[in-house]
From Swiss-Prot:
This is Probable carbonic anhydrase. Keywords: Lyase, Metal-binding, Zinc. Transmembrane segments: none annotated. PANTHER family: DYNACTIN SUBUNIT P25, GAMMA CARBONIC ANHYDRASE-LIKE 1, MITOCHONDRIAL-RELATED. Zn(2+) binds at residues 54, 71, 76. It holds the Pfam family Hexapep.
Length: 159
């Protein structure tokens, strides 16, 4: 089920068993394919331009509230808790779990079944926790998600 106040940009593709929560947005040319297992996207989250969100049998994709998935990221069969920023072109693979209040840096690769603890900054290939986030950084993740809610008001919705 896609909430009635979700904003979906022209060119985005959403198929299969997909649930998207209130005030979330899906941007230009993003692909969300719940054709093999389910995909759940929480409230106030955004899937930015050219992202791919997919799953594998037995590996649903679960994305929490206040999550920003940056341009070109690939999110596949993993769990992302609340208040997370996934940087541009990052990849998160099957069975990975990202704890709340994390930043996954641009181009980082979170490998299969990797668990990232809450409040972590992850960088590199393969992705490694490099330090704990500051309170200011944690706050900025939610602020970014809320900026996308506001920005999505300029979209015509193509549900």
């Amino acid at each position: 089920m896609i909430s009635k106040n979700v904003r979906i940009a022209k060119g985005a593709v959403i198929v299969g068993d997909v649930t998207i929560g209130d005030y979330s947005s899906v941007w230009y040319n993003a692909v969300i394919r719940g054709d093999v297992d389910k995909i759940i996207i929480g409230n106030y989250s955004n899937i930015q331009d050219c992202c791919v969100v997919h799953c594998s049998k037995g590996y649903p994709t679960i994305i929490g509230d206040y999550v920003s998935i940056g341009h070109g990221a690939v999110i596949h069969g993993c769990r992302i808790e609340d208040n997370v920023l996934v940087g541009m072109n990052a990849t998160i693979l099957n069975g990975a779990k990202i704890g709340e209040n994390c930043i996954i840096g641009a181009n980082a690769l979170v490998t299969q079944n990797k668990e990232i603890p809450p409040n972590s900054l992850v960088l590199g290939v393969p992705g490694r926790v490099v330090r704990e986030l500051t309170e200011e950084e944690i706050k900025s993740i939610k602020e970014n998600a809320l900026r996308y809610v506001k920005l999505s008001e300029t979209l015509e919705s193509y549900k």
